[in-house]
Swiss-Prot record:
Species this chain originates from: Micrococcus luteus (strain ATCC 4698 / DSM 20030 / JCM 1464 / CCM 169 / CCUG 5858 / IAM 1056 / NBRC 3333 / NCIMB 9278 / NCTC 2665 / VKM Ac-2230)
Gene: mnmA
Annotated site location: Interaction with tRNA: 126, 348
Signal sequence annotation: none
Name of this chain's protein: tRNA-specific 2-thiouridylase MnmA
Keyword hit for tRNA processing: yes
HAMAP family (alphabetical): tRNA_thiouridyl_MnmA
Disulfide bridges in this chain: 101-199
Gene3D superfamilies referenced in this protein's UniProt entry, alphabetically: Adenine nucleotide alpha hydrolases-like domains (2.30.30.280), HUPs (3.40.50.620), Translation factors (2.40.30.10)
Subcellular location: Cytoplasm
Catalysis: reaction(s): S-sulfanyl-L-cysteinyl-[protein] + uridine(34) in tRNA + AH2 + ATP = 2-thiouridine(34) in tRNA + L-cysteinyl-[protein] + A + AMP + diphosphate + H(+)
Role noted for this protein: Catalyzes the 2-thiolation of uridine at the wobble position (U34) of tRNA, leading to the formation of s(2)U34.
Binding site for ATP: 6-13, 32, 125
Length: 378
């Protein structure tokens, strides 16, 4: 099989490519140049997609004896990931740029070009698995290593995309074994630290980065009843569940800290309240997609049992869900967790599971507060 190995410059993609070579595939390595911004290209940057990463990817391919290329996807990355990130914050939502990058760059733009060039599959270092289901159709599953599992950020993949995905690290029980294997193979990235930051905000200062791109203006901080408590420097720079950065001179009546409950960009307001008001008992999702064949209940709109994860490496909770159209007729999901969840924000991604299988995903549109709402209907 002709395989295009996406080489990030990290240890996972290097070992994944090595295993693809061992499996007898005709492997070609490619590194994606995603940004020309100085903050992400300087030597020693903490984000990914740096000049150092490109050099490490080249050295890994040289060690493996496979061809190496660099593809410039910076323009599409800027439009589909960076601009989208800014637009979501402007709308008062909390986006996941890694999810968007997988959806529109790594498994859309990259895969499309790979197929055009005659490749059969794209190989990455993601910790996830593609397995046949009972009917023979392909399904996305969690990896053997729960601590490193990345099936959440791959929940955007479709059945057609899964047919061209190769995840050689799927059954590896720990990251330590991947590093040990890299060292045995003589790969220079064996001890390279993982990247944890948003790649285009390597210093981690999301608020400062947004302030340079969004027209932030001071506005009121209010409680759920609308009483003004203080002033913020820009509503769009806040996210649900945030506590830091709230300039509130007046303490809460119970003396407990306040958290962001809601961001209202059109009114330029930030609504705050006690921690207990972050509890959510019903979620609606928009722009849903299925990672493989939909569950049978999707055709009828009936409730189905599942498990829910709403942030990368976050907890997975039992839930029920159903597919429903909104008032405009657009498809969506309604999700009810078995217990209230804390800190769910519009813009995050809700990924549904059944056992180890990823059923699919949707972007969270609304999250209903459990303490301020009426009981759910059946």
């Amino acid at each position: 099989m002709k395989v295009l190995a996406a080489m990030s410059g990290g240890v996972d993609s290097a070992v994944a490519a090595a295993r693809a070579v061992d499996a007898g595939h005709d492997v070609v390595g490619v590194h994606l140049a995603l940004s020309r911004m100085p903050g992400t290209l300087r030597t020693g940057s903490r984000g990914c997609c740096t000049i150092e990463d490109a050099s490490d990817a080249w050295r890994a391919c040289e060690r493996l004896g496979i061809p190496f290329y660099t593809w410039d996807f910076s323009e599409r990355f800027a439009e589909d990931v960076v601009d989208d990130f800014v637009a979501e914050y402007e709308a008062g939502r909390t986006p996941n740029p890694c999810m968007r990058c997988n959806e529109r760059i790594k498994f859309a733009a990259l895969l499309e070009r790979a197929l055009e060039l005659g490749f059969d599959a794209v190989c990455t270092g993601h910790y996830a698995a593609v397995r046949p289901g009972p009917d023979g159709s392909l399904e996305l599953h969690r990896a053997a290593d729960d601590a490193k599992d990345q099936s959440y950020v791959l929940g955007v993949l479709t059945a057609d995309q899964l047919a061209h995905c190769l995840f050689p690290l799927a059954d590896t029980p720990s990251k330590e074994l991947v590093r040990a294997e890299a060292a045995e193979r003589g790969l220079s990235v064996a001890a390279k630290p993982d990247s944890h930051d948003i790649c285009f905000i390597p210093d981690g200062d999301t608020r400062g980065w947004l302030a340079e791109r969004i027209d932030l203006a001071p506005g009121p901080i209010v409680d759920p009843e609308g009483q003004e408590l203080g002033t913020h420097a820009g509503a769009q720079a806040f996210t649900v569940g945030q506590r830091k950065g709230l300039a509130i001179g007046r303490p809460a009546p119970d003396g407990k800290p306040r958290f962001v409950l809601e961001v209202r960009p059109k009114e330029n307001k930030v609504v705050v309240g006690g921690r207990e008001l972050l509890d959510v008992d019903r979620i609606t999702g928009i722009r849903p997609s299925w990672a493989g064949a939909p569950v049978p209940e999707a055709r009828t709109g009936a409730w189905f049992d599942c498990a829910l994860q709403f942030r990368a490496h976050g907890e997975i909770v039992e839930a029920r869900a159903r597919q429903r159209a909104d008032a405009a007729g657009h498809p969506g999901w309604e999700i009810e967790p078995a217990r209230p969840l804390r800190g769910v924000a519009p813009g995050q991604t809700a990924v549904l599971y059944r056992g180890t299988r990823v059923l699919g995903q949707a972007t969270i549109d609304t999250a209903r507060n459990a303490r301020l709402s009426a009981p759910a209907d059946a």
